[in-house]
Each structure stands twice: as C-alpha cells, then as structure tokens.
C-alpha cells in the first residue's frame, strides 16, 4: 500500500535519498508524509493541468514535477534518474503498458533502489472445503 511505501521511504535506509514517484496522481496527498518531501520527492505524471495543480496544492514543488506522457524507454528513465540524483524509484506493478520493465531495468543499470507496489491479489475460485462440498453435491 502507499502507506507502507511512505513508511519505507521514511526509514533510515531511504530517508536521505531523492525519490522518483511514478505511481500516478491518485496518491499525491500521501506524499506529504514523506520526510523532507519538498526537497526529496520528484513526481512524474501526465502533463494534465488538473493533475499538476493538485500536486502543487499538495505541496510538491513545481521544480519537482515532471509532466510527461509515456511510454518511457529504459534510457529515458535512466536520464531522469541521473538528472535529479534519484536514489529510489517507486512504481506500480503495471506490466508492459505501464513501462514496468523499463523502469526496473533503469534502476538496475543506475544502481538505485526500486520499490514496487504490487497489484492487489484477485481471489477467484473456491476453497478446498467448498470444492469438496460442490463435488459431493454432483455425486463425484
């Protein structure tokens, strides 16, 4: 969860590193709970005026907003990491459409940490006792 990520970013391991948030605009209000967020948090988001305004209103510095439309290559991710002296990249487990692999490869090539917000587990199916009960009702 984003709250777990904020806690991790505030831990001794990460609390002095610049952070590149590539998780979208939905969680912007949570970023203010990151220690020294005005200096450390860089936010890459769509160049949508409403999203940019909400980030500014939440206290993210305009100089720390990177308004870009993806998808982004590994090389572009690496360039952003170097340009802003990023030490931690935060991403969602988004698959190929979200450029997940390119972000992870960029963190590996630049030697920085990558924090991945996993997708919620979708629980489809039935438990073993439910399956046994169902099979018994079918005479199997």
Task: Label every model-predicted segment.
Residues 1-9:
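Glycine/small-residue-rich loop that forms an oxyanion/phosphate-binding "nest" at active or ligand-binding sites
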Residues 124-140:
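Binuclear metal-ion centers of metallo-dependent hydrolases, dominated by the metallo-beta-lactamase
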Residues 25-27, 94-96, 120:
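Short glycine-rich anion-binding loops that position phosphate/pyrophosphate groups of nucleotides
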Residues 56-64, 68-79, 83-84, 88, ...:
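A C-terminal functional module that forms or caps the active site or interfaces directly
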Residues 18-65:
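Anionic-ligand binding region
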Residues 48-51, 113-125:
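Short, flexible loop segments at boundaries between secondary-structure elements
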Residues 39, 109-113:
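A short helix->loop->beta-strand "cap" motif at the edges of active sites that frequently abuts
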């Amino acid at each position: 969860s984003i709250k777990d990520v904020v806690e991790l970013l505030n831990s001794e391991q990460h609390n002095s590193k610049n952070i590149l948030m590539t998780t979208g605009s939905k969680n912007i209000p949570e970023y203010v709970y990151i220690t020294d967020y005005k200096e450390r948090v860089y936010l890459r988001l769509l160049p949508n005026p409403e999203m940019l305004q909400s980030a500014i209103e939440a206290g993210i510095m305009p100089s720390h907003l990177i308004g870009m439309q993806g998808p982004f290559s590994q090389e572009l991710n690496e360039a952003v990491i170097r340009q802003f002296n990023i030490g931690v990249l935060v991403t969602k487990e988004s698959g190929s459409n979200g450029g997940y692999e390119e972000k992870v490869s960029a963190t590996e090539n630049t030697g920085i940490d990558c924090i991945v917000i996993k997708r919620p587990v979708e629980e489809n199916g039935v438990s073993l006792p439910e399956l046994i009960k169902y099979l018994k009702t079918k005479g199997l």
